[in-house]
């Protein structure tokens, strides 16, 4: 199953989770207030200082370019990040140029993640770091709206999560 099909299937759960009354994993049901805002995207370039030197066969570095992304919706903020290792061919300039072309205020529902992805794809191809940063911020935001971390939304056990920060080559 590819990512889009998974998100479509998971979307059914999101619709249920975003209904006016949802059951919390702990405690009594909580009532969510109706939301009528627009999405507001902001971003800021950042030079991330690494705690340890990152070494590859051809290079070594102690910093990495980064763009911090925020999507605000009705007083809640979802955070994302575009990390651009030099060997992937993206830069702070390419990411900020792409993000500057986005107008997320046309969307009033942060749960419409697939539509937002389609919109981003229509703005320009590639730009994977920038698109990933928006995706991360949307998931952070919708998790906050549901008052649930995503591992719970997806029914995952965080103790069984594999390590994912490896570079092989």
Region annotations inferred by a language model:
Residues 1-2:
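N-terminal secretory signal peptides
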Residues 5-27:
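N-terminal export signals
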Residues 21-55, 62, 72:
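C-terminal segment of N-terminal export signals and the immediately downstream linker at the start
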Residues 35-43, 72, 77-146:
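Metal- or metallocofactor-binding catalytic centers and their adjacent structured scaffolds
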Residues 64-66:
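Conserved N-terminal beta1-alpha1 strand-loop-helix module at the mouth
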Residues 154-159:
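Flexible hinge/switch segments at interdomain interfaces of large molecular machines
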Residues 162-166:
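Hydrophobic faces of well-ordered beta-strands that scaffold small-molecule active sites
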Residues 169:
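Catalytic beta/alpha-barrel core
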């Amino acid at each position: 199953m590819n990512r889009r099909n998974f998100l479509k299937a998971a979307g059914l759960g999101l619709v249920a989770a975003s209904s006016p009354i949802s059951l919390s994993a702990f405690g009594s049901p909580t009532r969510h207030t109706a939301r009528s805002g627009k999405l507001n995207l902001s971003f800021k370039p950042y030079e991330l200082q690494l705690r340890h030197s990152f070494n590859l066969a051809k290079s070594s570095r102690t910093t990495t370019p980064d763009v911090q992304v925020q999507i605000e919706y009705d007083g809640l903020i979802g955070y994302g990040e575009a990390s651009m290792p030099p060997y992937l061919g993206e830069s702070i300039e390419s990411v900020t140029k792409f993000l500057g072309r986005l107008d997320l205020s046309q969307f009033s529902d942060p749960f419409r993640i697939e539509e937002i992805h389609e919109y981003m794809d229509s703005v320009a191809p590639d730009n994977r770091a920038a698109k990933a940063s928006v995706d991360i911020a949307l998931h952070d935001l919708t998790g906050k709206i549901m008052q649930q971390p995503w591992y719970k939304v997806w029914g995952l056990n965080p103790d069984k999560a594999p390590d994912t920060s490896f570079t092989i080559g």
